From Swiss-Prot:
GO cellular component, one term: cytoplasm
Keywords, alphabetical: Amino-acid biosynthesis, Cytoplasm, NADP, Oxidoreductase, Proline biosynthesis
EC number: 1.2.1.41
Source taxonomy: Bacteria, Pseudomonadati, Pseudomonadota, Gammaproteobacteria, Enterobacterales
Organism: Escherichia fergusonii (strain ATCC 35469 / DSM 13698 / CCUG 18766 / IAM 14443 / JCM 21226 / LMG 7866 / NBRC 102419 / NCTC 12128 / CDC 0568-73)
InterPro entries hit by this protein: Ald_DH/histidinol_DH, Ald_DH_C, Ald_DH_N, Aldehyde_DH_dom, G-glutamylP_reductase_CS, Glu-5-SA_DH, GPR_dom
Name by which UniProt lists this protein: Gamma-glutamyl phosphate reductase
Molecular function as annotated in GO: glutamate-5-semialdehyde dehydrogenase activity; NADP binding
Predominant location category: cytoplasm
First-level EC class: oxidoreductase
SUPFAM superfamilies assigned: ALDH-like
Length: 417
């Protein structure tokens, strides 16, 4: 089965690579329209997936990731339209010039070819990834979580209908609908057809891909994100940022998981934090330095376990740790962070600059929420993933991250001397 999918994807990629920006946008507009026109079939499939997931005991965080509503589906369609409005990087001349020999040389952006994406129970990823791949002239093979098999099948069927109506092969966007995990191992060895693999899931999936894949892998999406509250932070303003970073949508990878509080502000900050977190329904996992004081407040508090500093809660849970100073905060982030998104809240711009320079994450913020690490917020449109590695792409992966380049030399029967 996968062999045939690979062949179809490779053949489709050749045709996609030749499309103009106008032709690609026409396809995307058709997909957006069809997602809305056929929303009932997608929502019905999703309702079945959610019911099965609930019966199987999936957590509230996972159910939130899985669920589609009419508003969310409309938002997904609107995201596709936003991709239409983005500049097409394919064909862009990055740099170039004329050599002494007279050869005119340029470095031009081109599609990668075929992209494989393995992802968790988030049905919006199916459309986000497909739209970005099509915009950049790439074919894609999708392997979503078993919890979303019906939703993904219905969504990809709609996308393939749109492709066919525009005269393009259905092989441009395909989904593996068999939940057999053995197929993942087979997918990892399809370097004959797939040019880049993006796993979006837990540490176990990332480890499997790094160890078994014969395809170049871009890893990311695990977000143990931190906010450091410096001693000069404005408490009222800091709390607004923390509430946003923790509670706006707790199931996302850019949600803050650990709050590091400077010891010199702790006495005034912790009572205010407890009140705010109680109102937001957040459970605090406090270290020894913060536990006693937080236990006198209204928020639910438990003693933090050492291993929880490495946890991506994806829920209304927040670690709270007292640190001595900026150095202590940076050391903690280096030990427990995942190089995703980290922030400092401070009025001391020297500390802010040190934090920016010394915290080695894909996104670092000063006086802002970690929730901004998102392709749409960055003006990149929908994202394929948030890369936490350093080669090829880092941070939210928009259109440029789905391209490579080729060198083109144009001469007049020019020979090398």
């Amino acid at each position: 089965m996968l062999e045939q999918m690979g062949i179809a994807a490779k053949q489709a990629s050749y045709k996609l690579a030749q499309l103009s920006s106008r032709e690609k946008n026409r396809v995307l507009e058709k997909i957006a329209d069809e997602l809305e026109a056929q929303s009932e079939s997608i929502l019905n499939a999703n309702a079945q997936d959610v019911a099965d997931a609930r019966a199987n005991g999936l957590s509230d965080a996972m159910l939130d990731r899985l669920a589609l509503t009419p508003a969310r589906l409309k938002g997904i369609a609107d995201d596709v339209r936003q991709v239409c409005n983005l500049a097409d990087p394919v064909g862009q001349v990055i740099d170039g010039g004329v050599l002494d020999s007279g050869l005119r040389l340029e470095r031009r952006r081109v599609p990668l070819g075929v992209i494989g994406v393995i992802y968790e129970a988030r049905p919006n990823v199916t459309v986000d990834v497909a739209s970005l791949c099509l915009k950049t002239g790439n074919a894609v093979i999708l392997r979503g979580g078993k919890e979303t098999c019906r939703t993904n099948a219905a969504t990809v069927a709609v996308i393939q209908d749109a492709l066919n109506s525009c005269g393009l092969p259905a092989g441009a966007v395909q989904a593996i609908d068999n939940p057999d995990r053995a197929l993942v191992s087979e997918l990892l060895r399809m370097d004959k057809y797939i040019d880049m693999l993006i796993p979006r899931g837990g540490a176990g999936l990332h480890k499997l891909c790094r160890e078994q894949s014969t395809i170049p892998v871009i890893t990311g999406g695990i977000g143990v994100c931190h906010i450091y509250v410096d001693e000069s932070a404005e408490i009222a303003e800091a709390l607004k940022v923390i509430v946003n970073a923790k509670t706006q949508r707790p199931s996302t990878c850019n949600t803050v998981e650990t709050l590091l509080v400077n010891k010199n502000i702790a006495d005034s900050f912790l009572p205010a934090l407890s009140k705010q977190m109680a109102e937001s329904g957040v459970t605090l996992h406090a270290d020894a330095g913060a536990l006693a004081q937080l236990q006198t407040g209204p928020a639910k508090v438990v003693a933090v376990k050492a291993e929880e500093y490495d946890d991506e809660f994806l829920s209304l849970d927040l670690n709270v740790k007292i640190v001595s100073d900026l150095d202590d905060a940076i050391a903690h982030i280096r030990e427990h962070g995942t190089q995703h998104s980290d922030a400092i809240l401070t009025r001391d711009m020297r500390n802010a600059q040190r934090f920016v320079n010394e915290v080695d994450s894909s996104a670092v913020y000063v006086n802002a929420s970690t929730r901004f690490t998102d392709g749409g917020q960055f003006g990149l449109g929908a994202e394929v993933a948030v890369s936490t590695q350093k080669l090829h792409a880092r941070g939210p992966m928009g259109l440029e991250a789905l391209t490579t380049y080729k060198w083109i030399g144009i001469g007049d029967y020019t020979i090398r001397a």
